[in-house]
């Protein structure tokens, strides 16, 4: 009992560590957040490991602890949401409510993976011992491998699609028409940049991109059209390569605009790190938000610039 309990806890914690992004541009990053996630994963794994022997002993009141754990993890989600929303006012580029909700939901769901993997590890151990009459050591080894396999499956299933999966990102030129009206690629009228110095900064230091939905799909274009998804793309650019602007410089705030004829999205930025390849990668790696999906399901069989369904 003692051995398999600790094995189940370790497997549960490992399942959480597998999903942690330790890149400084991702979450969790800071040591205090990392520590809190490890502690929460320990609590969740211990609950999952204890649940099996409790059920074997017909102690059904143990289900109460699961409900308390679920409530606690929902509180973690609320706390993460509140923390990120409180930081919005001091961000040069905001994440947006949709992106914040996605992050908070991810924090909650990934704690449940600890319960599932530790529960399966301990449960498989008892099945091997009682039904297949395997030795204690062999049962621990097999159940550990089963728990790790489940952890990999959960990690794969919880991976979100990114912009690179639904769209191509290509560089385009930034220019100005009628002296001060910004044009990105072939889309005019993005915004009015009144100061000559600001226009020169865009022309000399700016980068333009066009995000083109793959297969001319209306569904993919609809994801790009979502305001929350656009804001997430801008924030991902800001977090990866930076943006040259002060809080009192609205001219350099990126304004994504849809080209309705092509269903594409164009963006002009003045990055700190002027590298078009890094900019393209930042856009492609942006996760697709759950709130941006499914809004154009009825048009999934239609193509942009084509009549009728395919």
Residue ranges: model-predicted function:
Residues 1-58, 62:
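Membrane-anchoring hydrophobic segments
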Residues 63, 114-140:
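Alpha-helical transmembrane segments and their membrane-interface junctions
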Residues 257-310:
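Long, non-transmembrane cytosolic or organellar matrix-exposed soluble domains/tails
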Residues 79-92, 159-169:
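A cytosolic-side transmembrane-helix exit/cap motif
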Residues 13-19, 66-78, 144-155:
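Alpha-helical transmembrane segments and their membrane-interface exit regions
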